[in-house]
């Protein structure tokens, strides 16, 4: 009887309002999972976007956490060795085999090692069945037949050392200074995946093989297939290639529970290369693994607290209530398998650390006393539910890599993989449990947590002296805890966007450029390029291309134009504030971005084909009714001034600026002085930004989507045809004047033992470079990049990666080649000499039939994807317009690709790249 009473009481308690039964979450029905007899698990997820493409990932459920003390760095070293020899593919043959398929290392083939996992990734077309089989055979050998030859191991030591060296910068130093506080009592603290360079220098092939055999076993693996592939075919590939792996058992992955560090700590990170001064409060708490409805709600509560804090902080900065800081943020980050951190940060204006501390204390204490309002919570819920509903509507267009990554995360954490529909429906139902009161309780739980630390970041001695002592921070906390603070008043949301369109606007001419490609001229002079994509995406892309950029402005303004553009992006449009615009954009399924470059400005809006009008409204308002919030401008302006003041303290940026000024004899390359920036008002910035689109006749609108022309004409004439000429039109820019003398720049100010090398070679093309020539140069550069990788990375073990990039300036009629790498300081001359020798040899040799074939395969794959991707097709048309003044130039690329010959490529390369006009060499060395 007592047991029955207890049971009835328990059931009644669980059914009380506000209480959740820990019901399991539903797995996405599209996901196929299983396990082979040898223990290997698999996940198959059919996804038809992009068409005929598939991602194949091999996940090893072991990373650096499982290393012994004498193995720190071995997990990462083993990952590198998978590309340096297996039983069937010795030495460099694995990479060569991938390249023979037209796959590129880094883009199509890659791998990474983290604390918890090691993952190998290949992306390739599904139409090439022989290649699919061969890739699966490589995965099989990665799983069981790596060779670890001594010669290859010794060669790779230098590559890994240079990878470690390449990351020695201010960000790395800041991370190292934070780690003892953030990762206290975690295994992560002394198990960075890159490891110890002493281990890298001394580990033997036998030790690498032992680690490999201990962990690379089927029961410690998951194979993930995501893409446009039949699930039965995918399963057959897995079984045919991976079921024969021996059913050996991997060692058991150990678990190190994180212990709370239950006392308040204080940290100051003083680094001259920090871009800002600021103060932050970090909390550490157990990670919420979302396995059931209860944890689903709990994770949403933590996430909403972060979003509510960020939203309120930005609103108060925009309103002018917080003029003493230049910005701030809250975030949640994973710090261990079982632990996370929530932090709240504000950035100081200048070096006013006391003002920053006051601002953060006031924000936190206001929430302590009043919590968040029902209006704020409703706004966040509504916005997030709209995002989730949009995700349901757009699930067929999910990014393939992101989708695969989410599946890998689900596999790693052993959590359900929810479909967009289930996520939306669960959120709509379960978020009713999240109230102002429940968030207040969650907030108080956080604030009472003793596992916390204060962090102050400073970049100069003045700021360091102004940093608060632990006693001062504690006193300030007590002061604000006892201070009666006014509740925050939510300003509400204005979600209307009024557009004054001209009903008289019309199309004055029309021309067919190619199949599914049309050019329209509007009565106001604007040009419209309409393209129908071949895919099934329900996306509409609108890109306004202005032939005005920052080079249209005099030297006294040029470097501030991008800042003005950023201020506009953060201020909203028309009647909508920045926060209201985010909500309006979510409800109308639109996004907007902009970019200012030398000769052009791009304004890009993405909308939906079943509701395109909001996209046209938004681009109209961004051009005709842009705005700059005074407080946003003041904040950005202050940050720019501080960055200029401290430029001498950031050697990498100073080096890049010196190289920029060296390559051009033009005042427009020079940075403005502090007083020039300070004199530039918000009104000046807004006027400058509006001048970028001051004349419709200088704008081309590129519109791409799977939608008929007749459905768009009315929107085009109404919203694009009604854009009027400005009273102060801006002239088109002129190319920067090139420096005519060779030059060398050496800066000895690097704070870490690493050299940064850059070499620019300029070639005078005399005439514009057409598309066939550009393709020939690109084919050559792919072969050159491979030579540089083999000679400098693999044979000389001198650099982790070598960048080789060709660029063409159609206005200046010249070609530039950039060679860049980081290395051991003592070797920079040797490696630069070697790189130039490699280029001379490649110029003399030209490219081979096999190399041309690899290039053609690679480009053809890109073209196949491009035709079906609205975003990529729009970008391609824009590039054709900017590079060749012809929006239809790209339509010839497939035919030109077939017509390419080794002779034509090598002739073009020798014509254009044999004799550089100028060479500019720079090296950044340690002090």
Regions found by a protein language model. Name each.
Residues 22-41, 230-272, 276-286, 290-291, ...:
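Proteolytic maturation boundary segments
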Residues 45, 50-64, 74-75, 92-141, ...:
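M16 family metallopeptidases and their MPP-like homologs
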Residues 72-80, 84, 307, 558-566, ...:
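Active-site recognition of the HExxH zinc-binding catalytic motif
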Residues 150, 157, 209-239, 451-452, ...:
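Non-catalytic, conformational "gating/processing" segments within enzyme and secreted inhibitor domains
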Residues 66-69:
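N-terminal plug
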Residues 1-2:
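N-terminal secretory signal peptides that target proteins for export/translocation
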Residues 144, 152-226, 231-238, 247-249, ...:
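Hydrophobic, small-residue-rich alpha-helical packing segments that form membrane-like cores
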